[in-house]
Swiss-Prot record:
Subunit composition and interactions: Monomer.
CDD domains: Anticodon_Ia_Arg, ArgRS_core
Compartment(s): Cytoplasm
Single GO term (MF): ATP binding
Keyword annotations from UniProtKB, A to Z: Aminoacyl-tRNA synthetase, ATP-binding, Cytoplasm, Ligase, Nucleotide-binding, Protein biosynthesis
Span of the signal peptide: none
UniProt cross-references to SUPFAM superfamilies, sorted A to Z: Anticodon-binding domain of a subclass of class I aminoacyl-tRNA synthetases, Arginyl-tRNA synthetase (ArgRS), N-terminal 'additional' domain, Nucleotidylyl transferase
One Pfam family cited in the UniProt record for this chain: Arg_tRNA_synt_N
Enzyme Commission number, as recorded: 6.1.1.19
Name of this chain's protein: Arginine--tRNA ligase
Family matches, as InterPro entries: aa-tRNA-synth_I_CS (IPR001412), Arg-tRNA-ligase (IPR001278), Arg-tRNA-synth_N (IPR005148), Arg-tRNA-synth_N_sf (IPR036695), ArgRS_core (IPR035684), DALR_anticod-bd (IPR008909), Rossmann-like_a/b/a_fold (IPR014729), tRNAsynth_Ia_anticodon-bd (IPR009080)
Catalysis performed (reactions): tRNA(Arg) + L-arginine + ATP = L-arginyl-tRNA(Arg) + AMP + diphosphate
UniProt motif ('HIGH' region) ranges: 132-142
Amino acid sequence: MLAAQKQRLTELFQAAVAPLVASTDLQPTITLERPRDPSHGDVACNLAMQIAKPLKKNPREVAQALAAALLDNPANRDLIEAADIAGPGFINLRLTAASRQAVVKTVLQQGAEFGKSNLGNDKKVIIEFVSANPTGPLHVGHGRQGALGDAMSSLFQAQGYDVTREFYYNDAGVQIATLATSVQARGKGLKPGVEGWPESAYNGDYIQDIANDFLAKKTVSASNGEPVTASGDINDIESIRQFSVTYLRREQDLDLQAFGVKFDNYYLESSLYADGKVEKTVDALIKADKTYELDGALWLRTTDYRDDKDRVMKKSDGTYTYFVPDVAYHTVKWQRGFTQAINVQGSDHHGTIARVRAGLQALDIGIPQGYPDYVLHKMVTVMRNGEEVKISKRAGSYVTLRDLIEWSNGEVVDGEVRDLTRGRDAVRFFLISRKADTEFVFDVDIALTQGDENPVYYVQYAHARICSVLAQWTDGDEASLDKVDLSPLTAARETALLAKLAEYPETLQKALEELGPHQVAFYLRDLAGELHSYYNAERVLVDDEALKMARIALMSATRQVLRNGLALIGVSAPARM
């Protein structure tokens, strides 16, 4: 159902119910939904059941009165064809054929804008995702964050929000020191497992690559950063640290580029210390009497803000616990004007939510409860050749995002540099094809198949099929299809396809409200299914000119919606497969 149709039906129900509640304080909510069973009509409303009990009436009788009010008005006949009462008092409406067909004209006229709205009214939203430590290549978990975060950002942009995609670099922790000593050890000729190899060091082959470039005094640069030139002195641990961090930031940039993800801003954790923001945050909490000292440590009274226990802010050795810079960072987000902040992170961050929110509330600077929002995802298991893959040579202890993209792209041909679009499309679609809070098994073998079991192929093939049909239509102009008579579109498969097209705008809004971009992937799979069923049941280029033109318009509109949805989740829409 189109937005304009939904608004009109809402107003019609409001007018119909007004006389029934005029002498009461009732203010019923008009909720319109699509019935799960298409045979029940196009629109379902539970209004009668809302008001029947306070009116002391039978809900089915109330539903009959409301339905009669809708049908008796001649002005409604262009929109409503029939109304039925189902179950305890649901009102099921069947829209006119012209109303169902109107979506084709709307899609063709709006094109790439179909599904978008100004709901956000330019409200500033910051979505932080990936935010990997610069200590190694991106892994598949970062890939899931990238797919989720980028699609979520596009959802908010499509609904009129002013979105900033941000990558937060944790470049100030103990892991950075471990990275530096790992590179130093490699530079001295040590290898994992031999005497003198540092405990907890990083073992991947990439550490040797960094050491080689450091000894060669190479220069590297990364996003939003100055170039760094290695000193070449293997005893210069600070130069090793700076070079290694920048080297890996550059590598992560290349991974993200291959994945088709671009960030608007990169924020360094180290800048929070350099600018004094961490100290200022701690001082503000102390002055507000939200802290206390115990056993030589500084504690925050997080139990005052729904946490299950108070948390240490500064340990007895004088170092801060990891949630303190997080509080400072989110204070900065708020001060930058982001009234909504969303963090896409792994489920292992669950324990930080309460303490970060508690710290922000304790500052008492106007930040609302529940800020920021969190979308936590569960782990990804990678299967290849029927077996689980747990490590890669590149990283040493985990499967990298780059591995997954390359594996899903297919085999190397004659050693040539490949276009990684196929692999990127598969990984991005697969990684948002489940709810974030469910574990996901990524089967590379399925990603490489060209059949219905491969969801991205299934959707892209629907788009390519339409392109093939329209390429055979050589005696017309697509620009004029929005003027075609659509009344011949009466076949059952056409009705189902029309209904699915009309669901797209509401799908986007629901996905945004629930922070669930997986719903877009679900929708695209369903739309592709309707298209394939229609394609197998009906011919498009028939001899009947009026029917042919109506079906061509329907195909063009379906292609546009497939293209819009795929673009939103960062997947290509090929014309040929």
